[in-house]
């Protein structure tokens, strides 16, 4: 059990038998009336996001989620295989559980896997990922019909928009949460 004062991003709540992760929260104390907490909750299994409001001080059931450091090893058909960094046990996770994170998953990458009651729930990639551009069109100096970006294909097959000066073979820093370009890695 946790009070609304204990809320933080990433805390997993158990509501009506389902697991919900706090994505965003805000304590509100209006001039008139009792204080309350506005939250944005994401269903851990389905990914559905809902808004929920709690009165301040209310106790809420929390779920015990064990986050383990793992290393991504390889893809086996529709499964992604991760190795636990402590006991070296391998965990095959289905593509549905890995979800959108597969866009930036590289072999040997450190990844956190969240478990509840021994079953894997979801994975968390590092916030920034260093990844190589395998294909992009050459950017022309006077080509400014767009906002100065062009599409690029990464070594994982993902496509992102990059500035015009990026070339094939460049190593980039990419935000794994939204696929945004963060910068070029200096060799």
Curated annotation (Swiss-Prot):
Short name of any one Pfam family annotated for the protein: Elong-fact-P_C
Organism listed in the record: Mycobacterium marinum (strain ATCC BAA-535 / M)
Superkingdom, taxonomy of origin: Bacteria
Family the entry assigns: Belongs to the elongation factor P family.
Keywords, sorted A to Z: Cytoplasm, Elongation factor, Protein biosynthesis
Record's protein name: Elongation factor P
Pathway: Protein biosynthesis; polypeptide chain elongation
GO biological process, one term: peptide biosynthetic process
